[in-house]
Structure formats: C-alpha cells, structure tokens
Amino acid sequence: MAVEFIFLFMNNLNKSTKTILLFILLFLGYKFIALSQPQLTKSKPDLTQSKFYSNSRPWTRWWWFASEIRKKDVADNLIWLRKNGFGGVEIAWVYPINRMIKDTIHYTPRQKWLSPEWSAMVTYAKSCADSLGMGCDFTFGSLWPFGDINVPFDEATMNMTDPTWRQEIAASWDYPKKGYVLDHLNKDAFYHYAFRTGNALKPALIGSLSGLFCDSWEVETKHLTTKGFNEKFRKRFHYDLVPYIDSLYSKRMPYAAVRYNYMKLLSEYVIENFYKSFTKKSHELGAYSRVQCSGAPCDIISAYASVDIPESEALLYEPSYSNIVASAAGLSGKRVVTSETFTCLYGWPRDHHSEEQTADLKLLADAIFANGVNQIIWHGKPLNPAGEDTVKFYASVHLGKSGTLAEELPAFNNYLEKVSENLKKGVSVSKVAVYLPTEDAWMEGELPTEKQFIWAWGAYEHRYSYFPKELKAWRPMWINSEFLEKAEFSNNRLKVGDFSFQACYVDVKYMDLTALRRLTELAQKGLPVCLKQIPAEPGFHPSDAEYKILLQKLNQLKNVKTSWQEMDQIGPLITGTESTDFWCRETADGLTLFFANPHSQGLIFPLEYGQSLNHTTDSIRIAIHNKGSTVPYTLVFRPYQSLLIQLGSDNKISIVDIYFKPKTPVYIKRPSVEREKWEVLSPKQQTN
C-alpha cells in the first residue's frame, strides 16, 4: 500500500518536485518500504504447496547488459513495469552492448561477474521488487546455456568425435573474454558451477520466494557425451558405441537403432544429472526451479515433469508445442505453466522491432492460453538508464515508453492477468491420453531440411508433434512411458497426476518394451486402448520374443481397437470445436473453458505484421458434455475477442468478462525471399 500511496501522491506534483522526490526515494534505496515487508526465510520452503505467484499479472524477462548497474536505474525500471501492469521480473544477465557491433577492443566497465559488488546490485533489485509487491526470479547464469569463464576444460561440454573440442560461451557478462559451456551431463561439474553461482545469488534469495530460471537447451547436441558415457553404454546395451559414431545420425540401419539406444541413455543423463540436479539445488537455495526444457535431447515429458514450473516458448515454438509442457505439468501435479512469450514475433532476429502491434500479441497469447499456458512471461524489457528508453534487445518485442506497445500495455496486461488467473483454478481436464512418439523421433534422427531451423535440426525436439484431429472434442493430453508406469486404472479411469483419462490412444511406429509392457498391463485391467498401428521395438539388439508375445496379448483384448470410431463408449468433452482451440479446467464449482478466437488457430513462425487484422464476427455452435448432460451453446467471437465461460455444477453457463479491444492493426504482407535468415539450405541448394 505504501508504494500505491506514493504513486497517487506523486501524480499530483509538478515535474520538478516529482523528480526531486523520486531521487530522494532512490537515494534511500527504498529501505523504509523494504523494512515494512515480511522478510521470509526459505531454508525449508514448502514448494509442494506453493502457488509460486501471488497474483497472475504477467512477468517480463529483464535483460541486464554487462555494465555498471546503478540503483536508480534498477528502481526506475521496476516502477515503470509496476505502473504498466507487470507482476514480476526475471533478471537475465547478458553481454555488454558493444558486443552487438562485435567490438572486442573497448572494455565496458561493469561489476565483476558473481562478485560481492554484483551480488549487492542483484540483492538491491530483489528488495526493490519486494517493496513494489513484485516477484523477482534469476537466470542461473549469463546468457544461454549455463557456463562462464570459470568452467574448467574438463568440466565443459564434450563431443565424442573430437576429444580436444569444448563448446565455448563467447557472449556472456564477461565479454570479450570467452569461457566454456558447462558439461550438462556431469552432475559433479554442475554442482561446482552451482556452488559459486548459488553463493552469489544467496543474498538476493532473502525475502519473498524467488525462482531460479534455466532457458532452453542451446548446448551443442550432436555427438554429445561426457566422461564414462561409452563405458556405461557398453554395460547397458552390451555392445560398443564407438564403431557407429561417424554415422550416428544416418537414417539407415543399424545406425538408426544404435541412435535410439544412444538417445535413451543420453536422456537419462540430461534428466538425472542436469534437470533434477538443478531443481534440487534450487530447493537447497530456498528457491523454485522454472525451466524451459525445449531443445533438450531427452524424454521431453519426463524432463518438464522434473522441474517446479515448466515453461513453454512462443513463437519460436508453435503454440501447439505448449501442449507437451502442459501435459507434463498435469501428469506431475504442477498447476502453473509459464511461457516465454512474443519472442521473435515477426521473424528472426529483429523484424519490426519496437513497431509491434498489440492485436498481434493478443492473437498469440490467446493461442497459447488455449494450449495450456496460464502465466505469461514477456520477452521482454532491457534495463535502461533512469528516464530513458534507448537500450533494446534484438530478439524481442520491446517493452519501453518509446515502443508502439506502450499506450496499450496496462489494459493488455490486465487482460492477460484475468485469463491467467482463471486458467490456474482447479485442474486441467482431458478425456484421452495420447502416447507421445518419442521413440519415433529418436529413430528418425534429423528433420527434413525444410523443417529445420539454423538452431534446430532434430526430430527429438517434437516441434511438429501434433494431436490427431479426430481427438479434438476429447481435449487430448500427451503421456509417455514414465507416466504410463505411474498411472493406475480404477473405476474405469486412468488416473495419474491431475488427470483422469477414459482411454489411451497410441499411433506410433515404435514403442519401447517397457512402455508396451505397461500398456498391456493396463489394457488387461480394462483400459480402453486405440492402437492405430502395430509398433515395432526400437533399438539395436531388441528382445523380440517378449515383445511379440505382448503384442499378441494386447491385440486379443476386446477393449483394444484399431480405430477411434470403434471407441464409441468414450464420450467427448466438447463437440463442434473444429475451428477453435480451447482449454478446460475443473473446480468444485464446475468447468472453466477458454475458447481462442478462430484466427488464433494454426499459428506458425513468423507472424505476418498485422496478421491479426479481423473485421468478422464468427459464430460456432458447440455442445458441452458434462456429467451425463449435454449443454448446447453458441460461441460468438467478435473481432479480436476470445471467450471465457464457466459451466456451473448445475450446468448453467455464465460469461466471464475478459473484453479487451486492441487498436486495429495495420497489415503488411511479408516480402517473399528465396531463403529466410533462419532457414537451412537443402543439400541441392548447397551444391548450387
């Protein structure tokens, strides 16, 4: 309340008096406000019960370019964010600005990385955020991925084709000095890195609960290895990996089968030694973990399920990808799904920078809400000198008073807050679990050239894993081998985490023996299974005998069908939704349903400038099937509007007011070019 009172008081002052008062407040460091805040200790944080966020206001990534960070700048930026409807920040430490022009001659003065002076400024930022009623998370390193100039050669990322190679990190806080990327498969190396990084952040973790953040993978993944990997591989699979290394990414046999075994072991290293270790260390420091597992060479559902807050990303990942993240959250009982949002909205690296249109942002936000996200993290806000807005980050929509978004920010953020708040209530609802084709992706290896980006080559990322269209009315969720194993079938429901499924849908070329074994067990207990095709066992030296027996047992069961049309005992959730994406949450009071405007369907990177332009009203007739009753309803989508409705336990529908009308966008068709900056040359193009 103190800060809100100060804002109201200052609004009635003239400019010069306001400036003097602000300077006094900044000089005092907000200590008189901070002292009034409860100083919580988190030596034993109860993260199992934590809501993590005190409200649903959107957050933003907050880039600190390597420089001499000043208290008055920190406070000024936070005040601006608070006034514009933001609920928190995620501090991300990056290179000095002169790195953008590849200047390696002129050194930018800055607090030394992880030094007491650096820690003091970070702690000040946290105390300012606390005083403003804002949250504050911290990236657990500088730039992406984890690594710095203190990582020794023998604890850096390794490649099995060249023992002298280590991945460098060249654009960190210490630029122009170069360091090494941490060996993410080496638990000891991680804890050495985490010890010094965590110690520097400890003072800032006093106060309100904070999160430690890990961005998307961005470790060189091809031929990734670590000490002892080959020996463990030989022990696990009873053959030597070395003879197959040179052709490990070939689609031919036996290399595809060997690659599956390699990916299976690599996945265990990534999840056990990195993601679980990161979450454990976060808890030791009294923080929660918030992680983008996207791009990691592992079982992606298990990875996302191993962290406290799984985070998606858009639009470098399509909105549909968020279903994987939200599925992992529901399977593991997590209630918050965040998203790094609006990244490279119109293209990479900086198309239409600072000219973004709110209507386009809303189009994307609605798409990810309908695919499971319930907390927005803007991408983002650079730390600027007090009173200025001259520093900008390239791969971002721009948050600042000089950007085109500034006028609409408070109202738009209020909209994002309302939707997020409602989509956090209760648990997500789905009628059918769909087996994610992880084995298929690992066997496939590289994506076709036309589907690759210069930063993404592998099918293992699941960028193009989509739900079957025939399942839309049942609001499917993904499941994997781990959660089939954890699930229990009782009272005609497959129960795991927050979900209570009525059936399992399997349409994969390959399925691991452990998954097939568990699927057969569940089907024998009565679980309805739609087995669209007969899978084969992946990997080199498979155990054919047991696999064939399990397939025979599975196919002989009456509750196992080969087409979804035969699964007529599984009633849908909502019919008539072919042209709108939706999300459903259930509370004791009934269902909360978010329906995205039909124009939000099928968004892909990049968005065209003004793609959201819309002058039409769309009406869609749906039927909600709930607890034995069918409730018909007509969805009326006015231009730029999505809908949030509540279906009470009495099956009566009420409308939640989330109306926000952005400025009418200007449409500019994207120029046609032979090849975009992010596209990969095909083999034919490379030879021309």
Task: Name each model feature, range by range.
Residues 83-100, 257:
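Short, intrinsically disordered, low-complexity segments enriched in Ser/Thr and Pro
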Residues 45-88:
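Mature N-terminal segment immediately following signal peptide/propeptide cleavage
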Residues 94-187, 191:
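Acidic/aromatic-lined carbohydrate-recognition and catalytic surfaces
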Residues 42-49, 416-419:
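A short, compositionally biased domain-edge/stem linker segment
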Residues 1-41:
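Bacterial Sec-dependent N-terminal signal peptides
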Residues 59, 70, 75, 88-89, ...:
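Carbohydrate-binding surfaces of carbohydrate-active enzymes
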